[in-house]
Design a protein with these regions (language model features):
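Feature activates predominantly on carbohydrate-active enzymes
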Residues: 1-85, 89-93, 121
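Aromatic-enriched hydrophobic runs in primary sequence
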Residues: 1-5, 11-19, 54-55, 97, ...
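Structural recognition of alpha->loop->beta junctions
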Residues: 11-14, 78-99, 150-169
Length: 196
C-alpha cells in the first residue's frame, strides 16, 4: 500500500482510499477500534501519503456486516465518530463512507453522511467526506433495486444528497474499473442528474 501511494504520487494522483473488504476494522468488525499495532500500520500509511502527496483516506463500511440501522443509529454514530477520532489522532485527514455492494435505505445513508460531514467540518482540517453509494457505476444502476421500501437509484441518491453539497459522491463510470472518457461524464450528467 505504501508503494502504491509512492507510485501514485509519482503520477500526480492525489488520494489513496484504504477500503479493503477483507480488513476487519473497515468492514466486518467496523464497530471495533484498532489495536495499537494495527493503528501504527495506519499511521505509517498516513505518513507515506503525506510524503508522496498521495493523501491516505480511510474508509468504513458499516452497511455490509452487522449493518447500522435506524434502531441502532445513535449508538453506532458514536462508535463511528470514536473510530474517526482514533484515526484522526494518527493523522488521517480524509474519511470515506462505503455503502457499495450492500443493502440499506438511501435516507439512512444520507443521514449518516450529514452527521459525519458535520464532524469533519468541526475538525477544521479534514477534507470533504467521500461517499460510495450502492449505485456507484452504470452497471450498478442495472443491479439497483428496492431496499426497505426505497428505490436504490442514482436519482434517489441525488434527491437525498441535495442538501449535502460538500459530500463527494463516488462514481466509477460505466463499470467498476473503467477508463475516464468524456462520453462517460456526459452520459452520467444527462442520464442520471437531469443535466446538473
Amino acid at each position: 500500500r505504501i508503494s502504491l501511494m509512492k507510485f501514485g504520487g509519482d503520477f500526480k494522483m492525489n488520494m489513496y482510499i484504504y477500503a479493503p473488504k477483507d480488513e476487519p476494522y473497515h468492514n466486518s468488525q467496523w464497530r471495533e477500534l484498532y489495536p495499537a499495532d494495527r493503528l501504527e500500520e495506519i499511521r505509517q500509511m498516513v505518513q507515506a501519503g503525506q510524503d508522496s502527496k498521495c493523501r491516505f483516506a480511510w474508509a468504513i463500511h458499516p452497511f455490509m456486516h452487522s449493518a447500522i440501522t435506524a434502531s441502532t443509529y445513535d449508538a453506532d454514530l458514536k462508535v463511528i465518530i470514536a473510530k474517526f477520532e482514533q484515526l484522526y489522532n494518527v493523522g488521517v485527514r480524509q474519511f470515506v463512507l462505503s455503502a457499495d455492494d450492500a443493502a440499506g435505505k438511501v435516507s439512512l445513508h444520507a443521514r449518516l453522511c450529514k452527521d459525519l460531514d458535520a464532524w469533519c467540518k468541526s475538525k477544521g482540517d479534514v477534507y470533504n467526506l467521500c461517499f460510495v453509494p450502492q449505485v456507484y457505476c452504470a452497471g450498478a444502476v442495472n443491479w439497483s433495486s428496492w431496499s426497505e421500501g426505497e428505490a436504490q437509484t442514482v436519482a434517489n441518491y441525488f434527491k437525498h444528497f441535495e442538501s449535502l453539497p460538500d459530500v463527494e459522491l463516488m462514481w466509477t463510470g460505466e463499470s467498476v474499473c473503467y477508463p475516464a472518457r468524456q462520453s462517460t461524464f456526459n452520459n452520467f450528467k444527462n442520464s442520471y442528474t437531469n443535466g446538473r
